[in-house]
Design a protein with these regions (language model features):
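Soluble, non-membrane globular domain cores that form compact, hydrophobic packing
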Residues: 1-268
Length: 268
């Protein structure tokens, strides 16, 4: 996407700058790896001004796929609203949304006097210039619905991302990488934390299951290795189901069974 020269009363103040997978660190150093853990292609950055003195900074990330646009949106979101893009979140002076393969953020420049409606106006204008739609990853929709904590779903690929959301181990015991999909979510019952991973091949799921059980649960399906929190795992075709934290063996077993039933609709 090329940023439009004007959106409503807002006009580009500078020529937009584009960063790719290699130069992203010139723009956002520490957070660059978050985007690179997805199929990130590049980001276009622009600054808009309006006559009243308001100033907005715009970032349009091309995440490569609609699934990864959702993934980076889900990475740290606390709420999810409809009406801009596929979904959006507004926190203070920042509004972010995802749509098709794009993840977009609009931020008010500190110290400027932008109208209260400016963020949504700019976001809607940008949304109109993007391809419509956006489907959540099928793996996210395979999460059991009963007891799911709203907006707790995190879609990602790598071991580093898993440890950011839920620290499992220093080693990559689940053999996670950019070639697989993973989703993590919290549940009220227990409470519990559930991880689903799609390895795309049964043999790879089997290898990951063996590695996880050998290093975390002593080679068995379920155990209590973490200060009263039950951990359990099971393979369902090319998928791995892991209950990372639950208050009881019964709760972890129930969540395993529920997830297995949901995943059967996705079996390759």
């Amino acid at each position: 996407m090329n940023l439009p020269e004007t959106i409503g009363e807002w006009a580009l103040a500078d020529f937009p700058v584009t960063y790719d997978r290699e130069t992203i660190f010139d723009y956002i150093n520490g957070a660059g790896e978050v985007y690179r853990s997805y199929a990130f292609k590049g980001v276009q950055v622009g600054r808009y001004q309006e006559a009243g003195g308001g100033e907005l900074n715009v970032e349009v990330f091309d995440m490569g796929t609609t699934e990864d646009a959702y993934g980076v949106f889900s990475y740290a979101r606390e709420e999810e609203r409809r009406g801009i893009g596929a979904a959006f979140e507004s926190r203070g002076s920042v509004l972010c949304f995802w749509q098709d393969r794009f993840y977009v953020c609009v931020a008010e420049e500190p110290g400027t006097d932008a109208p209260d409606s400016a963020l949504e106006q700019m976001a809607r204008g940008l949304s109109q210039g993007l391809p419509p739609g956006g489907e959540r990853p099928a793996l996210v929709d395979a999460l059991p619905e009963e007891g799911l904590v709203p907006n707790s779903q995190r879609f990602f690929h790598t071991h580093q991302s898993l440890n950011y959301h839920y620290y499992l181990a220093r080693e990559n015991v689940l053999n996670l990488g950019t070639e697989n999909d993973a989703v993590l979510a919290r549940y009220r019952a227990g409470p519990s934390t559930l991880l689903l991973v799609d390895y795309r091949e049964e043999s790879k799921a089997s290898e990951a299951l063996t590695s996880f059980r050998d290093q975390i649960t002593g080679g068995i399906e379920a155990a209590e290795p973490r200060s009263g929190a039950f951990v359990a795992s099971r393979q369902e075709g090319s998928y791995l189901i892991v209950v990372l934290e639950s208050a009881s063996g019964e709760a972890s077993e129930a969540l395993l069974n529920s997830a297995a039933t949901r995943l059967q609709t996705l079996r390759r």
